């Protein structure tokens, strides 16, 4: 079974299959389009993945600059977002390298991307968190961070001390926090176990199959600075 980071680099179809079952009530779309004015905006999106966040606003934005560190996953995003080819410019960049960009945007958004860098960086985590905050705030009038508040959890909580530190820093730096439900829905528990386990690991797979879950609860945090 591939690990989470291997999935991003080499298994875009598996990742896309996962996110296509996520948020079956469409709560992220409802939130982003009720609270953010996207019309004719220049948007920078970091960690575009297969385009799941982008689909929520791309039809309204004037231009999207899409960044990811994996050409493999960008290729999948290009397929998923082929209706908006003229509106999107793709670039390969690691989130650590945001400071190298000269671009300015009206809105910056990232979804389930910066958190991975925070979790990976054990030596300079505090500095990495502040870099992500400072470099995005200086490049856009509005900044939106979307990160996990727990998958297969009974209530919303940061999954681990590292992400908790990240989320507290966002609030301390002027971001407002919002929590939504982004539950997964599958046709049967075998499918749920296969797909969720392929990304989150055997422990989640076994729990889903043992409890015969077809709907997997998930909470998502949205932090907005403007």
Q: Where do the protein language model's features map onto the residues?
A:
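Class I SAM-dependent methyltransferase SAM/SAH-binding core
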Residues: 44, 50-97
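Conserved Class I S-adenosyl-L-methionine
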Residues: 50, 178-226
């Amino acid at each position: 079974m591939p690990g989470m980071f291997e999935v991003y680099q080499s298994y875009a179809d598996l990742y896309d299959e996962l996110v296509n079952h996520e948020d079956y009530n469409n709560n992220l779309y409802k939130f982003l389009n009720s609270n953010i004015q996207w019309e004719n905006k220049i948007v920078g999106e970091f960690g575009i993945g297969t385009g799941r966040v982008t689909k929520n606003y791309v039809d309204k934005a004037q231009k999207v600059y899409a960044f990811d560190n994996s050409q493999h996953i960008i290729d999948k995003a290009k397929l998923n977002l082929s209706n908006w080819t003229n509106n999107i410019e793709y670039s390969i960049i690691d989130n650590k390298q945001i400071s190298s960009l000269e671009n300015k945007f009206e809105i910056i958004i990232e979804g389930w991307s910066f958190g991975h860098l925070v979790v990976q960086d054990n030596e300079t985590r505090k500095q990495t968190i502040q870099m992500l905050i400072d470099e995005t705030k200086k490049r856009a009038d509005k900044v939106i961070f979307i990160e996990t508040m727990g998958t297969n959890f009974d209530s919303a909580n940061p999954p681990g001390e590292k992400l908790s530190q990240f989320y507290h820093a966002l609030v301390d730096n002027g971001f407002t926090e919002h929590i939504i439900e982004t539950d997964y829905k599958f046709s049967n528990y075998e499918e749920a176990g296969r797909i969720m386990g392929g990304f989150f690991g055997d422990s989640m797979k076994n729990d889903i199959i043992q409890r015969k879950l077809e709907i997997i609860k998930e909470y998502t945090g949205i932090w907005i600075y403007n």
